[in-house]
Regions:
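Intrinsically disordered, low-complexity regulatory regions
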Residues: 1-98
Length: 98
């Protein structure tokens, strides 16, 4: 965990996660979140777009961050993950344009 991070360091950390380790582990976000969306629909009967599935994860991270800040804290991982999910959203958008 980087204690004294500026915004660019957060974004670089998020970028390295979504284009490196996590993408290698989970596949491209379009494929990964298409599968997650399909599982969610099977469980709940609620249809989401792939973009909405990614945005749901952004909402989860923002909720955790809001709780941490309300408690006087700061949750580095939630900041990085939120930036990463926004990056995933962009990757999904561009992959669908092709």
């Amino acid at each position: 965990v980087i204690e004294d991070c500026n915004g660019s360091e957060i974004l670089l950390e998020a970028h390295s996660l979504i284009t490196g380790a996590r993408q290698a582990q989970y596949a491209h976000p379009l494929e990964d979140y298409t599968q997650a969306r399909d599982i969610f629909e099977g469980m709940t009967g609620v249809s989401l777009t792939v973009e909405q599935a990614v945005m749901f994860m952004v909402a989860v991270k923002l909720s955790r961050l809001r709780t941490a800040i309300a408690d006087g804290g700061w949750h580095h991982d939630s900041i990085v993950d939120t930036a990463g999910y926004i990056g995933c959203l962009s990757m999904v958008h561009h992959a669908k344009e092709r």
